Amino acid sequence: MKKGSITEAINAIKQFDKIVIFHHVRPDGDCLGAQQGLFHLIKANFKNKEVKCVGNNNNLFSFINMTFTNQIDESFLKEALAIVVDANYKNRIELRELLDKNLFKAVLRIDHHPNEDDLNTSFNFVEESYVACCEQIVEMATVAKWTIPPVAATLLYIGIYTDSNRFLYSNTSYRTLYLAAILYKAKADIRIVHDHLNHTSLADLKFKKYVYNHFKTQGQVIYFICTKKIQKRLRMTADQCARVNLLSNIADYKIWLFFIEQANNEIRIELRSNGINVRDIAIKYGGGGHNNASGAIITNKKQISDVVSDCVKKIVYN
């Protein structure tokens, strides 16, 4: 899927003096890196623009400072461009109530997910060939010849590094590595990123042990169900349990899944695969994503067996 262009996104940013940048709920390295990295890019290259980031990093990546301004006057919104990074539907966007006011002059979506949206966008840079939204933004900076300050470089590197699973995913490309090298040259603090992300706590170790002792299999599908009872026992939050890649690339298993029970009793599904299109399955259950990495929400535990069966059938008939 391709919608809009790099040039369209760059020109939209140039056009507005007031900008508000949004990230998605359950934030990760890519949405936060894209939001905060773009914030610093704009501040460094357009001294007169007022830029605000809304949301919350939920204490993720605490080794680097992130800026959020969640109280914004309506007078500001009426003159502003809203930029939504790494997301498409309002129910997936933190502080969506600001978008629901319908006060923004225009909306720009920058995203690498091949999904439609309900944002009523005026401008788009949607292209699924990128491994990360941060990769898109680094290319924007390169095309526009923007200065990349070290703090922006570090934030954008976080997004590329995490969303490519440390450059291991199949859609990691020459372009990905080239743009990451540009961030190296811009003095991204690579060491602090790698040290932080490769750090393992005792709680992490106990969680991994539990997963490896309690995973289940069906056909060529391997999966783990993380109930609220398990989360309480291991003293983990639902978000902390979103670790589907603990089951990645195990011989003879083409699809791996995590089912994570949420506080409201819904169950978050993380779907990953090696060469099998799991996006279709995610869409069936109201979700979406990429062919090899998608997600969805189901409403009860009885649906878990349905999802697993769909994955088994997908492999058989692939």
Swiss-Prot record:
It catalyses: adenosine 3',5'-bisphosphate + H2O = AMP + phosphate. Keywords: Exonuclease, Hydrolase, Nuclease. Its EC number is 3.1.-.-, 3.1.3.7. The keyword Manganese does not apply. PANTHER family: BIFUNCTIONAL OLIGORIBONUCLEASE AND PAP PHOSPHATASE NRNA. Bifunctional enzyme which has both oligoribonuclease and pAp-phosphatase activities. Degrades RNA and DNA oligonucleotides with a length of 5 nucleotides and shorter, with a preference for longer oligomers. Converts 3'(2')-phosphoadenosine 5'-phosphate (PAP) to AMP. This is Bifunctional oligoribonuclease and PAP phosphatase NrnA.
